[in-house]
Amino acid sequence: MAAIRNLLILTMLLIVCVSWNADAAPGAAPSIALDKRANENFSLREQEQPICEHCWKQPPPRRCPKFCLE
């Protein structure tokens, strides 16, 4: 009984790992694919908000305070 239960658990883990990796680019780890998506979304948000040159040189997240834009 325990062997069957362990086999089912391992099978479910394998299915989860395979489905998780299906989103990644071929040969890339899932975390890399998720990081690329996060960077793309961050870039889109940056384009929506004006930002000064001083704040642009700062490390992310780049948020320009009001006094900087005036």
UniProtKB/Swiss-Prot annotation:
**Location within or outside the cell:** Secreted
What GO CC terms are in its UniProt record?
Answer: extracellular region
Put simply, this protein is called U-scoloptoxin(04)-Er3a
Q: Does the keyword Signal apply?
A: yes
The main location class comes to: secreted
The record describes its post-translational modification as: Contains 2 disulfide bonds.
Q: Which domain of life does the UniProt lineage start with?
A: Eukaryota
Keywords from UniProt, A to Z, are:
Disulfide bond, Secreted, Signal, Toxin
Signal peptide as annotated in the record = 1-24
Q: Give the family per the record.
A: Belongs to the scoloptoxin-04 family.
